[in-house]
């Protein structure tokens, strides 16, 4: 995992095996191991088999309303299904990703909701269905004197060979709106920002 993420994930005090275990996890910015942002508590994983279908179950002390399940179906179509779950993260964790978050130093809460998410690969074509909603609550930054800046929702919806995105403002001094899509590895997004009256 460290190799795949180019060292951006740091595992410490791991217990168990690759099939079932837990670890302390931290995000590491490109600056190196001294720039670690630990995720509170431990992260747990467990592999199960439902007949011939493997399932990976992941949970985290800090952030998950219930375990997150990844189910892989093999055959003429390869399909990855992700269970419906609510996840809560403090925005301060984003500093562990490095620039630009370590400059912005955002604070607030990030809630992620997954609904019927499936990725299907058939005939070398990826199809996406389902929805992921990101709610950014009480966003603040050291670069802004306005606190909080606002509360925002980003919605990502799978629509076959493309994923559509929308951005809306629920409340706040900075009104943001936008829409876009990801299709054939090309991403476009148009957004508008204005101050509230």
Task: Give the ranges of each region predicted by the language model.
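Hydrophobic, aromatic-enriched interface-forming segments
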Residues: 101-139
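N-terminal type II signal-anchor transmembrane helix
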Residues: 1-3
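Beta-propeller and related beta-repeat scaffolds in trafficking/envelope systems
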Residues: 34-49, 125-163
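N-terminal beta-strand/beta-hairpin edge segment
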Residues: 9-103
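Solvent-exposed loop/turn segments connecting transmembrane beta-strands
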Residues: 15-18, 62-67, 143-146, 168-177
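Transmembrane beta-strands of outer-membrane beta-barrel pores
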Residues: 27, 64, 76, 136-138, ...
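Residues that define the transmembrane beta-barrel architecture of outer-membrane proteins
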Residues: 17, 37-39, 106, 148-150, ...
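Extracytoplasmic/luminal low-complexity segments enriched in Pro/Gly and acidic/polar residues
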Residues: 158-197
């Amino acid at each position: 995992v460290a190799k795949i993420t180019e060292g951006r994930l740091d595992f410490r005090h791991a217990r168990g095996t690759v099939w079932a275990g837990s670890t302390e996890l931290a995000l590491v910015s490109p600056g190196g191991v001294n720039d670690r942002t630990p995720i509170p508590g431990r992260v747990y994983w467990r592999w199960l088999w439902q007949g011939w279908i493997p399932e990976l179950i992941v949970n985290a002390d800090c952030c998950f309303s219930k375990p997150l399940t990844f189910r892989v179906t093999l055959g003429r179509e390869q399909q990855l299904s992700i269970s419906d779950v609510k996840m809560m993260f403090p925005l301060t964790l984003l500093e562990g990703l490095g620039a630009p978050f370590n400059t912005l130093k955002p604070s607030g809460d990030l809630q992620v909701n997954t609904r019927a998410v499936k990725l299907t690969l058939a005939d070398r074509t990826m199809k996406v269905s389902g929805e992921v909603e990101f709610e950014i609550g009480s966003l603040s930054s050291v670069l802004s004197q306005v606190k909080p800046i606002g509360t925002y929702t980003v919605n990502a919806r799978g629509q076959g060979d493309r994923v559509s995105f929308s951005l809306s403002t629920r409340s706040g001094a900075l009104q943001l709106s936008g829409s876009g899509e990801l299709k054939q590895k090309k991403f476009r997004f148009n957004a508008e920002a204005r101050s509230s009256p």
